[in-house]
Regions:
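Helix-breaking motifs and short loop linkers at transmembrane-helix boundaries and internal kinks
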Residues: 38, 71, 92-98, 109, ...
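Juxtamembrane intracellular "pre-TM" segments in multi-pass secondary transporters
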Residues: 187-219, 242-243
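Cytoplasmic helix-loop-helix junction between adjacent transmembrane helices
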Residues: 102-143
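Conserved MFS/SLC helix-loop-helix module at the cytosolic interface between two early adjacent transmembrane helices
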Residues: 58-97
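Extracellular/periplasmic helix-loop-helix junction of adjacent transmembrane segments
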Residues: 29-58
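Extracytoplasmic gate region of multi-pass secondary transporters
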Residues: 26-27, 213-260
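Helix-loop-helix hairpin linking two adjacent transmembrane segments in secondary transporters
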Residues: 137-181, 185
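Conserved small/polar residues in nucleotide/adenosyl-binding loops
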Residues: 265-267
């Protein structure tokens, strides 16, 4: 791989790191947020699950479609700015509704990270090295998950959950600037010996995907897996605190390095 391709891959992996770091830090701070905002477990469920996942899932395809037709570094930088701003604003929430809006905004913003990055990686790495490039990109998510849980738990005990959100949202703003000013837009299809000239409608794209049985099997499998794994990761810190009376620092370290290490082995 050329030096620029390596730099680009590192930048995209860093964006994915921040993506999962910001996504997971909420879970280790739920007990503090619940106490400060006087929330019920049902409301916490909306914040950790439906509010984020619904808009993340619904906007994934439209944003992926936008990445197919527009300048991808702009799509990625706007996504970074959006979810980072929502993460920082979460620290200002004074009630459930405000936090809900910020979580929805975070899910909408993060929906643009993975599809746009995958498209860029495919056009900057040859087919024989693409699997390794995607593994590096995915490792960024795993490390971000580890950091969000482990460091987020400790930081929240030092500066409180509000400032933790602000500090966690800041790196994404810096990455957005790097994406805008240093990322080059590669020619679509250049690594596969093809150029993209024909325009395909969104409905045609969706029909094409749904007609592939292998895609449907993967879609169902990943949906079920993520339903279980993210539900587990979002609620286990609260369970450990209530059941074993552990501190947020201890819980963050256990969850971050425990789950993160298993994820890295899986990669």
């Amino acid at each position: 791989m050329k030096k620029y391709s390596i730099y680009m891959l590192g930048l995209l992996a860093a964006a994915n790191f921040v993506n999962y770091m910001d996504r997971m830090v909420l879970s280790v701070m739920l007990p503090s947020i619940k106490a400060d905002l006087d929330l019920s477990d049902g409301q916490l469920g909306w914040l950790t699950g439906m509010s984020f996942a619904l808009f993340y899932g619904l906007l994934g395809l439209p944003i992926a479609r936008l990445a197919d037709t527009w300048i991808r570094k702009h799509v990625l930088s706007i996504s970074l700015l959006a979810w980072s701003a929502m993460t920082m604003l979460s620290g200002s929430a004074s009630n459930f509704l405000q936090m809900l809006v910020f979580r929805i905004g975070g899910g909408a913003g993060e929906a643009g990270c993975i599809p746009t990055s995958h498209s860029l990686i495919a056009d900057l790495t040859p087919p024989e090295k693409r699997a390794g490039a995607f593994a590096v990109f995915t490792a960024g998510a795993t490390l971000g998950l580890m950091f969000g849980l482990a460091f987020g738990g400790w930081l929240s005990t030092q500066v409180g959950w509000r400032w933790t959100f602000v500090l966690f949202g800041t790196p994404g703003l810096l990455l957005a600037a790097l994406v805008v000013f240093t990322l080059k837009e590669p020619e679509r299809g250049q690594m596969d010996g093809a150029s993209v000239t024909a325009k395909v409608s969104t409905s045609e794209s969706i029909r094409g995907l749904l007609s592939r049985r292998s895609y449907l099997h993967l879609l169902i499998g990943f949906s079920v897996t993520n339903f279980v794994s993210f539900g587990f990761m979002q609620w286990m810190p609260t369970y450990y605190m209530r059941t074993f009376d552990l501190s947020m620092t201890t819980i963050g370290l256990l969850m971050g390095f425990g789950v993160g290490a298993l994820s890295l082995i899986h990669i």
